[in-house]
């Protein structure tokens, strides 16, 4: 599983989510995550059809297929639930 995180410096929810993801990346070192800036990484923003509803998180399976997309702030507990339920994807 890979997690693509989209955010921007002007996004308040992105600022809130950054430390949550930092904690999760330490707790789940095997989890592959990548961050893309909404204003700078336009190719990835277009590729994944990311709107300005940030933060946006796109979950990909091992084949690179999207299986879940969430926008807005997410509790750490909910993210853990998603990770554990899909860790073998």
Task: Give the ranges of each region predicted by the language model.
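Non-catalytic, surface beta->alpha helical segment in thiol-disulfide oxidoreductase systems
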Residues: 59-89
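Chalcogenol-based redox active-site neighborhoods
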Residues: 47-48, 76
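Thiol-based oxidoreductase modules, predominantly thioredoxin-like and allied folds used
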Residues: 6, 29-43
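Non-catalytic interaction surface on structured domains
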Residues: 17, 28-31, 59
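Structural micro-motif
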Residues: 48-59
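Local sequence-structure signature of Cys/Sec-based thiol-disulfide redox active-site neighborhoods
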Residues: 1-24
């Amino acid at each position: 599983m890979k997690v693509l995180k989209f955010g921007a410096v002007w996004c308040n929810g992105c600022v809130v989510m950054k430390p949550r993801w930092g904690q999760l990346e330490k707790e789940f070192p095997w989890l592959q995550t990548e961050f893309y800036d909404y204003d700078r990484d336009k190719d990835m923003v277009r590729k994944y059809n990311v709107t300005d509803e940030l933060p946006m998180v796109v979950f990909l399976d091992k084949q690179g297929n999207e299986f879940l997309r969430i926008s807005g702030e997410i509790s750490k507990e909910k993210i853990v639930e998603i990770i554990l339920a899909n860790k073998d994807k």
